């Protein structure tokens, strides 16, 4: 974790593999001459705090949104007010959503958290987004490119 200033904190190397997306199985990293499954230690997440509210920005959330959120809560001492991230629940190699059981389990975890709003991008996938929307209701919104948000 690196606190850049009073408003910005970046962290990476998220531990835990709870509700890990199977879409990660096809993603590799080069280590020496080998290509093991990518552990995403390099993936960075950003906490932005302004006017007493904190937003988590987590890119495609390859480490799993549940694991990233837990790390963010450990850093903050509480849940962020909003999360902006793809949830990585669509497997582009196979052209399909992650299994309903995984999507539903992610939805249950997010529903039980104290985050006010989640905004998610393309790598969540349309089918997974619709399932999550049924669980999270107005707490979940889409994040198309060029959008403006107020937290």
Indicate residue ranges for each PLM-predicted region.
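Cap/insert and terminal regions of metallo-dependent hydrolase folds
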Residues: 39-41, 45, 49-56, 60-145
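Active-site-proximal loop/helix segment associated with metal-binding centers of metalloenzymes
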Residues: 3-51
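Proteins with a high burden of low-complexity, intrinsically disordered sequence enriched in S/T/G/P/A and R
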Residues: 1-2, 24, 103-106
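Short secondary-structure boundary/hinge segments and terminal tails
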Residues: 21, 91, 128, 150-151
């Amino acid at each position: 974790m690196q606190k850049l200033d009073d408003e910005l904190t970046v962290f990476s190397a998220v531990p835990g593999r709870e509700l890990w997306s199977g879409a990660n199985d096809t993603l590799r990293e080069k280590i020496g001459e080998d290509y093991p499954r990518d552990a995403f230690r390099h993936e960075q997440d950003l906490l932005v705090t302004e006017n007493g509210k904190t937003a988590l920005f987590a890119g495609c959330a390859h480490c799993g949104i549940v694991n990233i959120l837990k790390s963010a809560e450990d850093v903050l001492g509480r849940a962020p007010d909003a999360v902006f991230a793809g949830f990585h629940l669509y497997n582009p190699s196979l052209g399909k959503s992650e299994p309903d059981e995984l999507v539903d389990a992610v939805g249950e975890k997010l529903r039980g958290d104290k985050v006010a709003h989640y905004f998610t991008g393309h790598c969540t996938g349309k089918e997974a987004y619709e399932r999550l929307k049924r669980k999270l209701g107005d707490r979940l919104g889409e994040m198309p490119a060029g959008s403006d948000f107020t937290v």
